[in-house]
């Protein structure tokens, strides 16, 4: 449903959802309307998952405090400095921008190094950082290929992958 914070909009005959975040928002613990989540259960376990959406940052947007965008998650959907347990009961892969507007992927998973997930810059083949251009529509796509688990254990087989595209161009490929 529509609220003052969210509206269904039409742009070039395409419908979308416009979200406006209150000043000072950095996540759900900062108050009403400070996060967007779409939750659902898959009808069956999945080996590969995709998410793709279009985003337009308004002109004059101030990137200086950084920010986060939706991604994919499974199981306990770890985040917020909660490092996943070694039993492989959850993960999350989301997108963020830094103070300079550069785009990064961050992921919570069993083998992450720090408490706040591992981070990888989105960049082209020349290592030029990817950035959202205010006033322009961008298409963000993420693909997750999950590791399979060895029977009778919680150990992954390390054949998973995290891939990302910006406007149809691959800008991140991580495998394990």
Go through the PLM ranges and name each one.
Residues 1-176:
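Low-complexity, Ser/Thr/Pro/Gly-rich disordered linker/stalk regions
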């Amino acid at each position: 449903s529509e609220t003052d914070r969210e509206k269904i909009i039409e742009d070039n005959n395409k419908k979308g959802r416009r979200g406006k975040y209150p000043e000072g928002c950095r996540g759900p613990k900062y108050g009403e309307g400070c996060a967007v989540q779409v939750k659902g259960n898959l009808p069956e376990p999945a080996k590969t998952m995709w998410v793709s959406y279009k985003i337009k940052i308004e002109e004059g947007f101030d990137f200086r405090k950084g920010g986060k965008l939706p991604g994919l998650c499974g199981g306990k959907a770890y985040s917020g400095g909660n490092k996943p347990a070694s039993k492989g009961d959850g993960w999350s892969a989301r997108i963020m921008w830094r103070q300079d507007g550069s785009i990064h992927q961050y992921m919570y998973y069993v083998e992450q190094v720090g408490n706040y997930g591992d981070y990888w810059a989105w960049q082209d083949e020349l290592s030029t950082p990817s950035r959202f251009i205010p006033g322009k529509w961008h298409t963000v796509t993420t693909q997750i290929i999950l590791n399979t688990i060895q029977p009778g254990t919680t150990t992954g087989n390390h054949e998973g992958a995290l891939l990302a595209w910006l406007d149809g161009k691959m800008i991140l490929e991580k495998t394990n």
